[in-house]
Structures are given as C-alpha cells and as structure tokens.
From Swiss-Prot:
Pfam families: ABC_tran. This is Aliphatic sulfonates import ATP-binding protein SsuB 3. InterPro entries: AAA+_ATPase, ABC_transporter-like_ATP-bd, ABC_transporter-like_CS, ABC_transporter_ATP-bind, P-loop_NTPase. PANTHER family: ALIPHATIC SULFONATES IMPORT ATP-BINDING PROTEIN SSUB, TAURINE IMPORT ATP-BINDING PROTEIN-RELATED. It comes from Pseudomonas syringae pv. syringae (strain B728a). GO terms for cellular component: plasma membrane. It is a peripheral membrane protein. PROSITE patterns: ABC_TRANSPORTER_1, ABC_TRANSPORTER_2, SSUB. It catalyses: ATP + H2O + aliphatic sulfonate-[sulfonate-binding protein]Side 1 = ADP + phosphate + aliphatic sulfonateSide 2 + [sulfonate-binding protein]Side 1. One of its GO terms (molecular function) is ATP hydrolysis activity.
Amino acid sequence: MTSLKQQPPHLLRGIPLAVRKLKKAFGAREVLKDIDLHIPAGQFVAIVGRSGCGKSTLLRLLAGLDKPTQGQLLAGSAPLDDAREDTRLMFQEARLLPWKKIIDNVGLGLSGDWRAQALEALEAVGLAERANEWPAALSGGQKQRVALARALIHKPRLLLLDEPLGALDALTRIEMQQLIEKLWGQYGFTVLLVTHDVSEAVAIADRVILIEEGQIGLDLLVDLPRPRVRGSHRLAALEAEVLNRVLALPGSPPDPEPFSPLPTQLRWAN
C-alpha cells in the first residue's frame, strides 16, 4: 500500500466537480431545483443555509447515498460514480466500532499490510500514541480525529463533511477546523463542508455557497490569505454578508430534509 507521504503528485490533486441541472424530489416535494455548480480541483467549499434548505440532500447525492431525480454529477467529464473509491464522507458522529481498538477502526475494511499506514494517518491527526486504546477512552473531538484518519488512509481526492464538528465544544471545534484546513493544504483534496456555522464557513473555506429553498442563493468567494485571523474586520464583513442574506429569508419553520436508507455500498470515513 502506498504511503500517504509517498503519493505521486497526481494523487495529491482533488477531484473537479460539475453539477448540472440537478433536481431532487421526494414525492411531490422538490428539495433541490436546477442546481448548477462547478468546483475546481482542490477547492474548499462550505455549504450553508437554513435547516431543510437542501444542503444535506446535495451532499448525500454527491456521496452516492441517493440518486438525483434529474441532472448530472460529474468528476471532471466522467460520472461522479466513477470516483467513488476516491471519495470519503464524514458525519457528525464518528461512528467508531467500540469493540475494535483505535488503529483497527482506522484500518477497517482494509486487507494486507495496512497497520503502518494506519499509524501514519493517526500521526497526521495527532493521535498515533493512542493507537492501541479503545474508542471509549477518547473525547468527542478525538473520536472525530480518528474518523478523519480513517478517511485519510484511503488517500481521498474528494472529502465530504456533513456537520462533522457540530457536536463539539467551541475550543475543540476550532482545533478541528485548523486540523482539517492543515490536512487539506497538505494533501490537496477537494472539500465540501456542510455547516450551520457561518463563521466556520468563512474562516476555513475558499468559497461559501448558500442554499435557499433548494436553489443557490449566494455564491461567495472568500479571497483572504491563510492563515486567517479570526475576528478580523474582513472576515466579519463576509460573515455579515452571508448572515444578512439568510436572515432576510422568511422565517417559517422548514420541513426536515427527507432521506433514503443508507445503501450497503456507503463509503463513509472508513
């Protein structure tokens, strides 16, 4: 198995994504409506919006957990389905198996000599010394680091993050944001992060996309140097621009986003 540190240059580039005329309906309810989107290889994109707006549905379609009603999902010029081995998904819950040690959770599903790779992935997230402990010994933030290592061992070119930091305390959340940003800069994968936290979105993403009632309401480039200074005037101005757009929408309670059962071929961060 190729070491993470020995990947040839072409494996360090992310997947370019194209979404064309994408629609998703559940019965008579249309959740996504004619979404058109181009994401260059290696870009870090945050998707924000009110609950029920369709952002998690979009991520599920990109992850292959559901099928679009209409439209195309492309990796470059090829169907995105062709890139499933290069795609990993992280959820808000780490989904570690409690009866397997941490290193075995990282190598879950792999065959051959993978333990050195798993240790390397754990080192990348700062947990190599915890490799032979049980998941129960970890904090919530540490469990999410293991889930991230479980994604890294597969050398992803597309990393989909569905509110992975939502259950963490404020300080741990910032630390995880910084870790994800560091690893993204190191490995060059394309990232799509679904989050309710607008400040998180503008702090770590290249681009913030606001979904409004199933459509793209705002597509904002965050053209600021890294590392970004939290609390700076420029970051605050971008955050205010997104929040003002969100708060200008009618505030009626949304319906929850429907979902289909997880298919057996799901490739989350494992």
